[in-house]
């Protein structure tokens, strides 16, 4: 049975709740039944994917052996004290490439028996950015962010990171895979930056992963973005 991923976006009632989550959640969840992989993440400001931090909000990305383990974890996270808002989604793997701290998430979640699913798609991009490339990355990330927010079919996006700098990524939800593909392949600034990241070797490690979101609950900035799909 293919692994099940979950993504959680958590807004806390105060900054203390955010700090406690970032400091202690790795320990809190490391013994969770069926958990294969966990990343506790800070988030960018609002829907911006450029470097920055929104105090009072965190995210989790998890990979589980099975559906039952994922469901139990979602229930546990949703009951956390101190939450002002939370959104939770279950994800099936739909391809991609690369790794996250050596773990090849797209390969682990690949299921050749499942045909490409119509409808909404979720995407995670993340990278370990080399220190020498940070200035160039920061400048171009702001340009790409503006281009991204003018893209047709984008339902929601948040910047995420394991640290405020150098280990950053995005989680986005799109109307369908065609909308994301149009952005990735036809936006001139995005294409220019992709070429530059490869030719100048900006990243020590990177991952691009596609997912089919098939269940969600809660709200993200007052709404469930999958309801708009």
Residue ranges of model-derived segments:
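Signature tryptophan residues that serve as conserved aromatic anchors
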Residues: 63-65, 174
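Catalytic-core segment of enzymes that process non-peptidic bonds
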Residues: 77
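Short S/T/G/P-rich N-terminal loop/turn motif that feeds into the first structured element of a domain
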Residues: 1-58, 67-73, 82-163, 167, ...
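Glycine/small-residue-rich hydrophobic helix-like segments
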Residues: 168-195, 202
